[in-house]
Amino acid sequence: MTSIQERGTSAHLHSLKEGEASDRSSEMLPKQRSIIGSHVQRPPSQTTLGRSRAGSNTMNKVSGLDIARRPSENLLSNMNCSDNGNGGNMLNSFVNSALPPPKVNPAQTRRERPASNSSIGTKTTEVFSSTSASSSLGDTSDEGEGSDADKSKINTFPSILMEKATQGRGADGNGMRSASNNTIVEATTDGSKMALQKSMSFDDTAAEKTMNKSRHSYQEQFSSKKSQSSLLNSKQRSRAKSQTCSSTGYNNSSILKTFGISSKISNSSDRIEASSLEFNVPSQKPLNCKPLTPSQKYRLRKEQSEMNLRNTIKRKEKFYDSQEQILELQEGDVDDSLIWNVPMASLSTNSFLASAKPDDMNNLAGKNDLSEYTGGLVNDNSEISYTKQNHRYSNISFASTTSNASLLDFNEMPTSPIPGLNKVTDFQFIQDTTKSLASVYLHSSNRLSRSKLSERTKSSDFLPIELKEAQNQGMEDLILVSENKLDVVSHSRPSWLPPKDRQEKKLHERQINKSMSVASLDQLGKNKDREEKLIRDETNRQKYVLLLDRDITRNSSLQSLSKMVWDTPFSDETRSTIYSEILQSKTRFITKNYIQPFHELQELLTKMGDFPKNKEIEISQLIETSLRRKVSGLHDICPDLMLLLKIKSISSQGIVTGDELLFHHFLVSESFQNLGLNEIWNIVNLVQMTCFNDLCKEKFDAKVLERKGVVAGYLSQNEEFKDEFNTECINSTTWWNILERIDHKLFMWIMDIIVVNNSQSYKNSPINEDEFVNKDWEYYRSKKVVINYKILISFALNVLLNYHFGFTDLRSLCNVNDQRFCIPVFINDEFVDADTVNAVFIKKWAHYYKKF
């Protein structure tokens, strides 16, 4: 598709040549002379005025036609002003006749640009493959009326002449040339005719040569050999054409000098050729020898700038993700791009074998072909960084650094045989030499590794503690790590999570420091309390011994004892003695008068022979449900327990609630193991008759559910206790269900507290044995036994309020199948001290006991 101007030009030239061929030159000559006279002949004084008028008339004419102004208007005005001779008149008349004004389309209503053969939507992509270096060569065609006349001639005039020459070659060679020569001789001078024809031939040759060179230079990036051959062929063809034109006797330089554009055309063509060869892209002018439109030039420059930017980035990049060949996923079916991972280095010492200076590494990288890839690995500030923090940034191998040549001890190599003198083959000689060199390298590298390891050991004292933790987790030895890697590695986040940014790391470090400070203060407080408790326990144990020596049944001694027992349980050496003295005084009055002797009952059991099977089954079932299925079953059960329970079953009191627990824990306790079964029998019966007698149980059942009592005040405030605040769930029998879930150590401490709170001062009110002669147990109990049900109620209240989880009520507590379930909850943790947990339980119990 050709433009309006080109179609008019070609049509006019075609009609002109047909007229010349049919011998109608006489009719066309007067018309051409009239056109030449009307356009060219004007006084020299009116040159400037005529130029401005021509420009204004042209703008008015083009504006009225709704067509953009073309650079040819400036060309006509400049040529009219510069040429006043006959040759100039002939040229102006020819150009004006060859370039008529474009026709106006009456139906055109919008201001649209005329269609051209080189429109914006080009069909080829060769136009947009040039770089920005060649895009500036054709920018002179975009200049306005303020541009120089020479630039207008360079940009516009050769294209017109080239079109003329192209159409002239399309006709018959000899006939058309002779007819054209005859017509032009009659109308113009010989000099003007020679200038016109030589200009046409020169522009054709120069344009074709430039076009061929640009095309072949663009093809050089695909095949160098093919490009060179094509370039030689194009140069030979262009040289042949130039020789053909010069053989006709025409002088190319004379006509170019006539218009003043000889040097500029040659310089522009040279610049086009140089830029095309440098960037391996075609020139700005397309292959059809048509000038580009301004929009195409803009798109060309834009595309070239983008290509230059991409090439620059490509040269400066060190690594591309596309170059990484992933054969298979290393972590299952999950893509590596979906997982952040801090690089994990090996435990080898190869990372610090490189010790070259930055200057040596830069020189070595400049000699290497892969300098663009490895150049980025060298840090220019590594020497400064090394002096400050003793860190390494280099990853160049040990064998490739010239500075490490002195580290290789070649004296270790054995003497090699001389070829020709020794009977050694070349293969054996090379093999031995290779082994020797390898051994030298290995020994030298090991020696260097040891030296570097010693440096790491010396510098490890100045680094944070978290680096040692990272080393223990399997990461690289981070003793000589850089600051950048230290910022990424965080001991508060796993390595498979994304690294923290600076703000997040500061926030987390602040929170961690705060939490650690609070935890450290708590731990310091706990350690201090533990140390104080150890000192206090040891002091209280010594006081127990002193109280026994001073008479523990004194009123002052009992007051001190009641205070100390909440802090420290009785020792194994003093427990049995304290139990006996504070419950029945030193006279052991209850044991002598109201407890059946153990040896008599044992003899009775022996005389019975076979023990009743039903009773034996009941005792076995009692042991199974109360001990073996509970926390007590975690420890061995003494075989004497069955004997004691059988003896208790044939006694006058019989087996009461809690006998199996008391016998079991007293048998296991070191306080009573060495005393024998007789002493254990007496202690268990003494505790049952004084602390858990029938009167105490009756008062417990009556007071625990009292509406104005302490228990009702706590439990009635919470609706969750409305279903268990009754006699079926809370009574003296279900109270023992709590003791079934108590650990042995805490059980003995609880017994110590209960015994102490049921004691009385026998020193101030001693037992008068004559008063209780022939008196039953109820009479003695009413006179000398303290009934303290409050200590039992406070114990149950503590469990209901603070440890009521894992069971519905006290009645269902015995049905919990978990053997390890205990009160307080069993915590199998080395950082949790069982004594501390028990102390907290006792402290809460003391708090509720003070409420009664």
Curated annotation (Swiss-Prot):
Region annotation Disordered: where it falls in the sequence: 1-158, 206-248
GO cellular component terms attached to this protein's record: cytoplasm; Golgi apparatus
One Pfam assignment: SBE2_C
InterPro entries per record: Sbe2/Sbe22_C, SBE2/SBE22_M, SBE2/SBE22_N
GO process annotations (BP): fungal-type cell wall organization; protein transport
Residues with PTM Phosphoserine: 72, 201, 459, 517, 520
Subcellular location: Cytoplasm; Golgi apparatus
Bias (Low complexity): 124-139, 224-235
Keyword Lipid biosynthesis: no
Record field: compositional bias (Polar residues): 43-61, 74-96
Keyword Phosphoprotein on entry: yes
Domain of life: Eukaryota
Key words, A-Z: Cell wall biogenesis/degradation, Cytoplasm, Golgi apparatus, Phosphoprotein, Protein transport, Transport
Comp. bias (Basic and acidic residues): 15-26
Major localisation: cytoplasm
Protein function: With SBE2, is involved in cell wall integrity and polarity processes like bud growth, through the transport of CHS3 and UTR2 to sites of growth.
Family listed: Belongs to the SBE2 family.
The protein's name in its UniProt record: Protein SBE22
